[in-house]
Amino acid sequence: MKLNKITSYIGFALLSGGALAAPSTPTLDWQPQQYSFVEVNVDGLGSYKQLVKAKDVVDISIKWNAWSGSGGDNYKVYFDDLLVNQGSLPAGTKSGVVQFPYTKSGRHQLYLELCEGTVCARSAGKEIVIADTDGAHLAPLPMNVDPNNRNNGTIPGRVTGAYFVEWGIYGRNYDVTKIPAHNLSHILYGFIPICGPNESLKSIEIGNSWRALQTACADSQDYEVVIHDPWAAVQKSMPGVDAKDPIRGVYSQLMALKQRYPDLKILPSVGGWTLSDPFHGFTNKANRDTFVASVKQFLKTWKFYDGVDIDWEFPGGDGPNPDLGDPINDGPAYVALMQELRAMLDELEAETGRQYELTSAIGAGYDKIEDVDYQAAQQYMDYIFAMTYDFYGAWNNETGHQTGIYCGSHLSTDECNGTGVDDNGVPRKGPAYTGDHAIQLLLQQGVQPSKLVMGVAMYGRGWEGVLDANAAIPGNPMTAPGNGPLTGSTSEGVWEPGIMDYKAIAANAVGQGGSGVNGYEVGYDEQAQAAYVWNRSNGKLITYDSPRSVIAKGQYANTHQLAGLFGWEIDADNGDILNAMYDGLTAGEIPNRAPTIGVSGPINVTSGQVVNVDAQASDLDNDPLTYSWVAAPGLALSANNTAAVAVTAPSVAQQTSYDLTVTVNDGALSTTKTIVVVVNPEGANAAPVVTPVSDISVNEGASATVNVSATDPEGAALSYSWSVPAELSVANGSSATITAANVTADTTVPVTVTVSDGVNAVDTTFNVTIKDGAEYPTWDRSTVYVGGDRVIHNSNVFEAKWWTQGEEPGTADVWKAVTN
């Protein structure tokens, strides 16, 4: 700060004459020394522009008086120990008003020195507050966080974000001091409205929210942004900030929070569900220009914000207002909006030296994603927050997992993949709503995984009247219809019909032991990676994210190299979900399984013979596989990087064994196996050539047919001899029927078949796993089966997904194989 002498105005009065040897000690006036670069009418009513005035300079005015002594001929003003202003006075001046402009915020001790020549007397210190929205005048916010939130910290290079909502300070009594910000990289502030057509807003709070917005927008143009609830945002006295500060409300808390956690990113989220109507006017560039300019001014006014988040629900339509949405033009308008916002933020960065982020929360259904070219938009964006929740809810009575990663176990393959026709015979248009489908669709568009953040639900959605008697699959509530939204009181965590806070679910449905309380049973769909609680007696069903499912989301994010996770909304969590976000993101990827190799030996050939050898490799993770073959000197290979190779035996004078090694790699892990190739001399009797037999499974009491493929180089007739343990019986021959005895648990036993040409014999061994499954009946075409019923058919165990009769296991989607 340069000392300002030229523009200083000094009001003074000469109260006494002759000079004394020492200056008088000045006293500062009693009035508070408070200034602000953003002036807020903390007691007023009116529009946003009437209540909030921003300026670049504050005018400091310091009234002082020296009640005794000879006065002085110059003065100095200090903020703490920093000299910020000085000037000359008529000799003997004993009172006055020092005025000067100032451009830097802070909270200081103010001192005025009255001087006679170079000898000065300093006043007692007095607090001066020069407020600005960067929060530099504030002390770090004192926190009041639920101790269930661990001190995890953030994860370098990853996103752990959460929404904080403006209205949370009311009934939920959740202000900024309660945010576990030490564990967050991002806070998304909900919500900043756009002036203009907002018909959807009339549907909530009997129109009061809409009327409040009309007041806030009274002096603004359509498509400018404002503060929706000034009392909550900037007027109300809040914990942790002096009630007399010039700027109050949760904004003052957020400013102080940045003093405690300067690396935390806080973004205003513009729009939201019932505030999305004006976005549909952005197909008009003039409207976008108005909006972008307004956002720039908003960020210049509220300096604690680190960018902007756009929550347009939804480009193309299917948002809260059924009359809005242009599937053709909304998508290009969205991309243009991102480009124009990024250009504006770049300008702001050049002006301020700061960095600003541009993010967007987006719908996660296939029908939402297909309307926007996110690959084109991503170049302007830092992150895309995929709202992978709200897949099902009490807006209708169809139950399902509202935030599952994958399809529920109750869905057919066609329902999951979006193929075939629905119950009305109408062709399905796209895959079921799941987190995985959303992420995969975005990746298929070409979106960089490092820009994708997966959504976590810190709340549950629920229904009444979900009864087991109505379930298509007994015991699976997702196959029973609801009968209206979940009901309850706010004390039970139900703030609106059909929605319950996670912390209420944990306390009132899951319980401390985790096994369910108050009549609820705790369920988890392994296939969907989705949690639910269900009260069979009263029919209450709640689908939600649990710590287990959130950890699975974190592992999914790691597996697919996503940026991280974010949650809606932080006031509904007791710390469990945010802790689980950290645990999932630091737990590593879902463990990769190494490929398996099925080929076995020895392989018998004669000199010069060519034999095909197949690695018979598979991978449980369905990873693409690569192959590498290495043959001992003498063996010739047709290739060395294919799944099967043709091996040519050398000419030998006597029986010789050679090693043939194959390595199968899934991109991360590899498996290596060596097979012995036995080469017999030409003219000598060559042993039979036997193709290795793959391992099989068979249910106890059931039979399986095993075919042995063997040839003899001389064309001799072959005989087969089977060696089996007591658990099996077998009929000899190249095609044998193996019958399993009863076992008390799954049992694996070896079976050896000896193939002989009358001179030489070759053994090949494979494993038979006997499944303990005698309790399952054989499938009967005339019998009715319901979800969960198991049967044996063709030596395999199948489980019904839902009601079925006459549909053959292995050929119909209603059955899933339990063993093969």
Swiss-Prot record:
Regulation: Stimulated by magnesium ions; inhibited by N-bromosuccinimide and 2-hydroxy-5-nitrobenzyl bromide.
Record-listed E.C. numbers: 3.2.1.14
Reactions performed catalytically: Random endo-hydrolysis of N-acetyl-beta-D-glucosaminide (1->4)-beta-linkages in chitin and chitodextrins
Signal peptide feature range: 1-21
CDD domains: ChiC_BD, E_set_Chitinase_N, GH18_chitinase
Temperature dependence: Optimum temperature is 50 degrees Celsius.
GO biological process: chitin catabolic process; homophilic cell adhesion via plasma membrane adhesion molecules; polysaccharide catabolic process
Domain GH18: 158-588
Root EC class: hydrolase
A matching Pfam family: ChitinaseA_N
One cellular-component annotation, GO: extracellular region
GO function terms (MF aspect): calcium ion binding; carbohydrate binding; chitin binding; endochitinase activity
Keywords assigned by UniProt, alphabetized: Carbohydrate metabolism, Chitin degradation, Glycosidase, Hydrolase, Polysaccharide degradation, Signal
Active-site residues, record numbering mapped to chain: 313 (proton donor)
pH dependence: Optimum pH is 8.0.
Family: Belongs to the glycosyl hydrolase 18 family. Chitinase class II subfamily.
Protein name as it appears in the record: Chitinase A
Organism: Pseudoalteromonas piscicida
